[in-house]
From Swiss-Prot:
NCBIfam families: PRK09285.1, purB. The active site is at H171, S295. Belongs to the lyase 1 family. Adenylosuccinate lyase subfamily. This is Adenylosuccinate lyase. The keyword Lyase applies. N(6)-(1,2-dicarboxyethyl)-AMP binds at residues 15-16, 90-92, 122-123, 247, 296, 301-303, 309, 335, 340-344. One of its GO terms (molecular function) is N6-(1,2-dicarboxyethyl)AMP AMP-lyase (fumarate-forming) activity. Pathway: Purine metabolism; AMP biosynthesis via de novo pathway; AMP from IMP: step 2/2; Purine metabolism; IMP biosynthesis via de novo pathway; 5-amino-1-(5-phospho-D-ribosyl)imidazole-4-carboxamide from 5-amino-1-(5-phospho-D-ribosyl)imidazole-4-carboxylate: step 2/2. Homotetramer. Residues from neighboring subunits contribute catalytic and substrate-binding residues to each active site. It is an enzyme of class 4 (lyase).
Length: 456
């Protein structure tokens, strides 16, 4: 059976394949094979460039081009050849080595250097670099731009609605008014920090042999400064070198990435739930598409499905990222293999995040402010001005300011007339009374509008 979106087991490669395809070059089986191949070749090239390893001479132009072409021209057909070797070896990294041994026979200089493919390496030397590069590239090329797009769309909504007054709700109850714009940019302000951390996080990598001590390296070439050579090799690939490891790099860097992703996703979970609530309150309407159906039985329905989809997928993603952070940092003694199958699911976690991010962006594009609903809620909750009145009373030493307003408003439905009657009884300057008399729930928004306009 040919794998299609219809018969794929995972919705990542099925229903949502159009949303996740951008991650395929970084997290597919082909991608892992490609990055392993690249690391093996780059390691071989580093040996050839080291004058203290005479058995691997400096590469001539033909050999350099041949190796470069192996990387740049690598395709699914070549990957299938590696899979054929794996059927014999039952070992995926060894299959890459055998494939390269076979390829080296096609170049006059390289065929005499076959023994130096995978030289002094354990599989984890290759794998940890491959995964680090995959994560780094996926974040830079796909995840970060998508997060930036979401932040941009939320910021735009916030700026558009900077001065649209809104009744706040704390504990689900009416509270001091804010503006819709201010509530939206709050989320962007929160996202900035983890987004920056994600951009700056260094993913450590090791290249120090079977148990991290360069045993085989030193046995073969005791005169070579292997610590320097391997550190230079790892950093040349844009990664951070971890000099102290067991057989495996302990994955603390991947755990850090996972925890940052969870924080980003939790902020977006909070956002999707708030937008869902605002839609439920009628504060936002959603643009309708004529051909779409909201319910199989209720023709009137326009549901917040994009935000609900995002919420579900963010939860799935977080479950995996939390597991990565907890599981990958633990390995028995010098290593056990339980991390291997977990690492193969890195792309699954990023994919669920990406699906959610696309849903958030799509949902944002449908939002239309419903000012009449916002104004109605404000006009029905004049009691929220109690805070302003009692605070002004305190300024002028009006006795029992808080208690007076509590008695007047707590659990009561208060209208403008009730408040104005109360204000007239106060022993505060007439100018202060006049200012309070002008105050309405819609104008009592503090510096919310200015905060949005100043936000960048």
């Amino acid at each position: 059976m040919t794998l299609t979106a219809l018969n794929a087991i995972s919705p990542i490669d099925g229903r949502y394949v159009n949303k996740t395809r951008a991650l395929s070059p970084y997290f597919s089986e082909f991608a892992l094979t490609y990055y392993r191949l690249m690391v093996e070749i780059k390691w071989f090239e580093s040996l050839a460039a080291n004058d203290t390893i005479p058995e691997v001479p400096a590469l001539d132009n033909k050999a350099r081009k041949f190796l470069s072409d192996l990387i740049s021209n690598f395709n699914e057909s070549e990957a299938e050849k590696i899979k054929e070797f794996e059927k014999q070896t039952n070992h995926d990294v060894k299959a890459v080595e055998y494939y390269l041994q076979d390829k080296f026979q096609e170049n006059e200089q390289l065929k005499s250097c076959v023994a130096f493919i995978h030289f002094a390496c354990t599989s984890e030397d290759i794998n940890n670099l491959a995964y680090a590069l995959m994560i780094k590239q996926a974040i830079a090329q796909v995840i970060q731009p998508t997060i930036a797009e979401i932040m941009g769309s939320i910021t735009l909504l916030g700026k558009q609605h900077a001065d649209v007054a809104m009744l706040s709700r704390t504990h689900g109850q009416p509270a001091t008014p804010t503006t819709m714009g201010k509530e939206l940019v709050n989320f962007v302000a929160r996202l900035k920090r983890p987004q920056q951390q994600l951009a700056e996080v260094l993913i450590p990598a090791k290249f120090n042999g079977a148990v991290g001590n360069y045993n085989a390296h030193v046995a073969a070439y005791p005169e070579v400064d292997w610590r320097k050579h391997c550190a230079n090799f790892v950093t040349s690939l844009g990664l951070s070198f971890n000099a102290y490891t067991t057989q495996i790099e302990p994955h603390d860097g991947i755990a850090e990435v996972s925890q940052i992703m969870v924080r980003i996703n939790n902020i977006l979970l909070d956002y999707t739930q708030d937008i869902w609530s605002y839609i439920s309150l009628g504060y936002f309407k959603q643009k309708t598409i004529a051909e779409e159906v909201g319910s199989s039985t209720m023709p009137h329905k326009v549901n917040p499905i994009d935000f609900e989809n995002a919420e579900g997928n963010l939860g799935l993603s977080n479950a995996l990222f939390i597991h990565f952070a907890n599981k990958l940092t633990q390995s028995r003694m010098q290593r056990d293999l339980s991390d291997s199958t977990v690492l193969r699911n890195l792309g699954v976690a990023f994919s669920y995040s990406l699906i959610a991010y696309h849903s958030v962006a799509k949902g944002n594009d449908k939002l239309q402010i419903n000012k009449s609903a916002l104004q109605k809620d404000l006009s029905e909750n004049w009691e929220v001005l109690a805070e302003a009145i009692q605070t002004v009373m305190r300024r002028y030493n009006e006795p029992n300011a808080y208690e007076q307003l509590k008695e007047l408003t707590r659990g009561q439905m208060i209208d403008a007339e009730n408040l104005k009657k109360f204000i007239k009884t106060l022993s505060i300057p007439e100018e202060a009374k006049a200012e309070l008399m002008k105050l309405t729930p819609e104008t009592y928004t503090g510096l919310a509008t200015q905060l949005v306009k100043a936000f960048s």
